[in-house]
C-alpha cells in the first residue's frame, strides 16, 4: 500500500477479549484517519504497569480492547486538516495526553493536565468512536488511553502525537512515552525538588528508576531506593541511587524506620510511590518528614488507598501525579534531547525483546527477577 493512500488496513494486533491473563494476536481492521487524525505504523512498543491493569478491567472493563500506550512509529497517512503538520514517513510518539497551550490549566503552567486533550478512559477517540474492529466480525475494538500501541497500525488524534528526531534511538522513545518519563518528571516537574534534598523511591521498575534519575539530576544528596527484588540494587545505582533497602532483609522492621535510620531519624523530604500497591501507601507517607515531607503518588492502583489522617495532620503532604507533571509538547522534547545528548542513559531499562506474535509470553517474563522493560519489536 502507498504511504499516502488512506484506506482501511487489515493488520495484526494483540487483543484482550475478557478479564484475566489472556491475550491473542488477531487480524483487525484499522480505519483511515479522520480530518485531525494520524494513522501510525508501529515500529516499537513497550509494556507498562498500566497496560497490565487493563487485563483486570482497570480503569474501565471495556472489551475487546487493544492495550498499549507506550510506543514509537512512522506516520502512514494523515487526515486532510493536518497535511501541513505531519506527513507520511515522519517518526512520531503516540501519547495518552495532550497539551493545547490555551486552556486554563495549560496557561497556568501549574499542571500538565490539559482540559482540551485530557487523559481519556472511555476506550474511544475524541469524537466518541473507535477506528479499530475485528476483521472477521466487524466487532468494535476499544482503544487504550487514546492509543493501543500493541497493534501493527493505530489511529490517534494529532494532538496526542509528538514528532521526534529520527536519529533518536527508537526503543528509548518507546520507554519515554510513559514509564521512565513519569518517574523522571515527578522530582523535576511535579515537585521541583531542590539541590540537597533527601528522597526515597519505592518500587524500582522503569518508573522508579526514572524518579531516581530525575532526583539525581535535580541535585538530591541522598536517594534511597526500596524494592523487594535484590536485582534492582544494581539498576538503581546505575541511575544515581545512593542507598538501597530490601524489606525482605529486615522482616521485623518497618520500612519507614529503615528510611529514618539512614536520615538521622528524620525521614526524607520527598517520597515517590512507584509500586502501584495501595496497601503500602500509609507506610510510605510515614517515611517522610514531619512538618513538610511530601509523598508523590505515581503508581496506579486498582484498590482504594488507605491512609492515616494523623500522618497528614502532622504536616505531611500527599499529592498525585499523571505523567510526572511532564507536558507533552513543552517538556517531553527536553527529556528526549537529554537522551540524545547521553545525559540520560536508558540501556539498563532494556531487559527483554519480543515479537508481536509472542505477546502471550509477557505474563511469564514479567515474573522474572531481571525483568525491567519488555520491548515489542514490530520490524
From Swiss-Prot:
Enzyme class (EC, first level): oxidoreductase
InterPro entries cross-referenced by the UniProt entry: ADH-like_C, ADH-like_N, ADH_Zn_CS, GroES-like_sf, NAD(P)-bd_dom_sf
Function: Component of the monoterpenoid pyrethrins biosynthesis; pyrethrins are widely used plant-derived pesticide. Mediates the conversion of trans-chrysanthemol into trans-chrysanthemal.
Organism: Tanacetum cinerariifolium (Dalmatian daisy)
Name of the protein in question: Alcohol dehydrogenase 2
Residues reported to bind Zn(2+) 2: 100, 103, 106, 114
Tissues where this protein is expressed: Expressed in flowers and disk florets.
Gene3D superfamilies: Medium-chain alcohol dehydrogenases, catalytic domain, NAD(P)-binding Rossmann-like Domain
